[in-house]
From Swiss-Prot:
GO terms for molecular function: rRNA binding; structural constituent of ribosome. Keywords: Apicoplast, Plastid, Ribonucleoprotein, Ribosomal protein, RNA-binding, rRNA-binding. InterPro entries: Ribosomal_uS4 (IPR022801), Ribosomal_uS4_N (IPR001912), S4_RNA-bd (IPR002942), S4_RNA-bd_sf (IPR036986). This is Small ribosomal subunit protein uS4c. GO terms for cellular component: apicoplast; small ribosomal subunit. The keyword Ion transport does not apply. It comes from Eimeria tenella. It comes from the Eukaryota. SUPFAM superfamilies: Alpha-L RNA-binding motif. One of the primary rRNA binding proteins, it binds directly to 16S rRNA where it nucleates assembly of the body of the 30S subunit. Belongs to the universal ribosomal protein uS4 family.
Amino acid sequence: MLRYLGPKLKKLKRLNIHMQPEFSTKYFILNTNKYNNKMILSFYLLELFEKQKLKFTFSLSEKIIKKYILFMHKYNYKKFNLINIIEIRLDNTIFNLGYSITIAQAKQLIIHGYFFVNFKLIKIPSFLLKKGDIITLSPKSYYIFKLCKKNLYKKYIKNSNIYDTIYICKNTLISIIYSILNIYNNNNYNNILIMKYYSY
């Protein structure tokens, strides 16, 4: 699993990523201006900036991003752009549903076998979901069930229009994917700049 072990808050300010709800917006505005005023942005630097922003937000490697781009070119994907494909990964979906506080935590929970997709155990964070998929918690994840039942993760849920509400069924939680075409995008990634960066 790809992890960044450096100073994360400094990286978030540098790339202007509003990822964690508990970070103050005022703190971001005051500090991001310090970086933006010193940089003279060229077109290539803008492309590099967007690529680094994407990599850090979703904890992706260069190899995985290139794999998705080749996949798009091979199958002529017109319905999705690169951001849409990354957004329907299982780890990002778990984070958006509110089962975890960060994407890194979502990856760890998936690898440890806490989630079923269509009632099959999936331990691959990069698993791509599709419309109609059903996500359920495994019986051993009772503490996550208790937290979600008490709505302690409600403030972390960003895109209630994409995913249906979480159903409580006995001792498990069920989430159904209804739509994956209009992905909520909080950080406004520029898909064109990212694609041009990898076209060199």
